[in-house]
């Protein structure tokens, strides 16, 4: 057994002194004081820090199989554990794509061998993510895939998405969509706006995203499918999603930390660590995302952790791949910028990473109570640390946040009662 002493948990937004007794994989007792006298109890001192439920990230890229030079299941899940995440859902833009039962089983075998946290894999919507032929939804649903997505590309035709949603509704699985109309991206490498004009870099307009969301919410209404929108980035998208929810359509949405924190004006020049898809938008868009998150239009936060090799990101923005890493920095950045400055409560931020994503995807994680799995993270809210690439457990360090000083860093993460990350003393 393990006993976590000298910790604090959130109860209705208030920090309460708490001790947690863990028996095997599950929580046996949560109380302000636990009298457990046994020689076989391992005591973990939380040092007055927050004990939060293990975070749930419904959008990561682990790159394996096929992209191991960028990240592996092992390195990506070590990074997740360092960031406080105990459950991650990897996207299917791997080689091979998890578009058959055989490929999903091969992926699960790899996960069982090296993953440091719980990994719930997506299956693709279309074979090879090519957008021309649907996967076998029934067989893949029976195999227990998390949901269906072609993330990395948008499903380009309404007829294909309509057919996919009908199948997904039939097997009671969500469709998770990267929304991007290829006919409207114009080879862009950042947001189409004043900054892209100043830098002479082709831009992607807001409409490339919002047009596809508008199409898809109507298809979701027609099919009864649960439709989840990845990494919302524009004010128009927020408006469409808000209206869809008011109409009773089963739509949910996520936003990334970088779209909440940065805008096109933060792009210093031709620096590919600021290249992600969707791109950093205008400040008006960022404010709409913050409003949408707080009013419930956007349901949760997901990192879109997208590692790339250093030589890939050293290329100009027009040639470098899209994406930045985020697993190890997400909570500290948002805690520092929004909670410490009084814009959000600590309870709100923790919920965006735990109970909110778990609830919308019907996962029995993201909360701490008697008999639940002992998935948790201990977080130091008071010590400032600098984000340094040499501290990353990910194979990649492609992020614009290197050098930022942040609070709210996890010091220990536990999955099913086993420590999967502990800060070096």
UniProtKB/Swiss-Prot annotation:
Keywords on record: Hydrolase, Metal-binding, Pyrimidine biosynthesis, Zinc
Binding site for Zn(2+) 2: 151, 178, 231
An annotated GO cellular component: cytoplasm
Cofactor: Zn(2+)
Organism of derivation: Staphylococcus epidermidis (strain ATCC 35984 / DSM 28319 / BCRC 17069 / CCUG 31568 / BM 3577 / RP62A)
Positions that bind Zn(2+) 1: 59, 61, 151, 304
EC number: 3.5.2.3
Cofactor-binding details, from the entry: Binds 2 Zn(2+) ions per subunit.
Catalytic activity: (S)-dihydroorotate + H2O = N-carbamoyl-L-aspartate + H(+)
Binding site for substrate: 61-63, 93, 277, 308, 322-323
The name this protein goes by in its record: Dihydroorotase
Recorded family membership: Belongs to the metallo-dependent hydrolases superfamily. DHOase family. Class I DHOase subfamily.
Pathway the protein contributes to: Pyrimidine metabolism; UMP biosynthesis via de novo pathway; (S)-dihydroorotate from bicarbonate: step 3/3
Matches recorded under HAMAP family: PyrC_classI_B
Gene Ontology biological-process annotations: 'de novo' UMP biosynthetic process; purine nucleobase catabolic process
GO MF entries: allantoinase activity; dihydroorotase activity; zinc ion binding
Keyword Transport found: no
Residues annotated as the enzyme's active site: 304
